[in-house]
Amino acid sequence: MKKIMIVDDNYLSAEGIEKNIDWEALNAEIVHICYNGTSAIEAMKKESVDLIISDIEMPDLDGISMSRQALNINPMVKIILISAYDKFEYAR
């Protein structure tokens, strides 16, 4: 079973991702929900995950910086970055 981490400072967004996807049908489970990038990195140091779904814009440690650190911890982790912001720079 694949281990998934959700990282989003917006509780409703994180909960929406967790509850609206049939993770079991995908042979996956949510092992961590973190509300900032720093807690995500701390969780990764304790338990390896296969996929991180993360917001880009977060206080403390943004999703892009968190992704760089996560890849240093586990170069094989897959990362999906999401955002509700209309900033084209992120798409580049």
Language-model segments: which ranges?
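CheY-like receiver
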Residues: 41-92
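Conserved Asp/Asn-Gly motif in the active-site loop of CheY-like receiver
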Residues: 31-38
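Conserved acidic segment of CheY-like receiver
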Residues: 2-13, 17-18, 52
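Residues at the starts of beta-strands that form the adenosine-phosphate
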Residues: 3, 30, 78
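Conserved SAM-binding loop
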Residues: 6, 33, 81
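A generic structural motif
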Residues: 25-31
